[in-house]
Design a protein with these regions (language model features):
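Transmembrane alpha-helices and adjacent helix-loop boundaries
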Residues: 1-219
Length: 219
């Protein structure tokens, strides 16, 4: 292990880690919004939209992210829809993540007993108030373990961004290995930076689960 090489490559990995984190978080935020909308559509059994949401979830979950990225990056320009690599990466991650978030939120919503909705309605709440103040907070709390697992999964999936020439962590590692053959040092830095990104998310998720358990949610 050549520590001088590691010190030399460190700035490149820092830049790549920032790109990975920036695009990953952008895709995850969009995925959360898409997932919540799809979950609510399925929960309320909205005609037509429910079938569209179901078809989207099946398509997204049963095709690899790499294929989705290739379709967006190489396929869409053929029909006149052009975009850059960063937008493509965010869109691909959001498309994949939305389906996983939808299933996490849907399971949380469906775990709430119907009697809670009935009780809220009997107290004079309308459907919007019941969902906002009674159902959704509990469903979100119950969904925390699946939500955190999905966030970690999606951040790890950013490693395929290198396939569309985004200079993320994986691209940087492969590029440096190909140029200088410093395989051990490059892979060591790759592991360290992925741990620096993912370990805090995992620890935060565990802490949040414990807090919610003590507060009485998701028991």
């Amino acid at each position: 292990m050549d520590w001088n090489v590691i010190a030399q490559y460190l700035p490149l990995y820092k830049k790549a880690a920032w790109l990975t984190l920036r695009l990953g978080l952008a895709g995850i935020v969009i995925a959360i919004v898409v997932g919540l909308v799809c979950a609510l559509v399925q929960y309320y059994k909205v005609p037509v939209l429910r079938r569209i949401a179901g078809a989207y979830i099946e398509l997204s979950r049963n095709t690899p992210l790499l294929v989705q990225l290739f379709f967006i990056y190489y396929g869409l320009p053929k029909i006149g829809i052009k975009t850059n690599a960063e937008i493509c990466g965010i869109a691909g991650l959001a498309f994949l993540g939305g389906s996983y978030m939808a299933e996490a939120f849907r399971s949380g919503l469906e775990s709430i007993e119907p009697i809670q909705t009935e009780s809220a309605m009997s107290l004079g709440m309308d459907h919007t108030q019941t969902m906002r103040y009674i159902i959704l907070p509990q469903a979100m709390s119950i969904s925390v373990p699946a939500f955190v697992a999905n966030v970690i999964f999606l951040l790890k999936e950013t490693s395929v961004f290198s396939a569309i020439s985004l200079m993320d962590l994986m691209f940087t590692a492969k590029d440096l290995i190909g140029l200088y053959y410093k395989t051990t040092e490059c892979l060591f830095l790759l592991v360290v930076f992925y741990l620096l990104i993912l370990l805090p998310v995992s620890l935060l998720g565990s802490w949040l689960e414990r807090r919610l358990r003590y507060a009485g949610f998701g028991a």
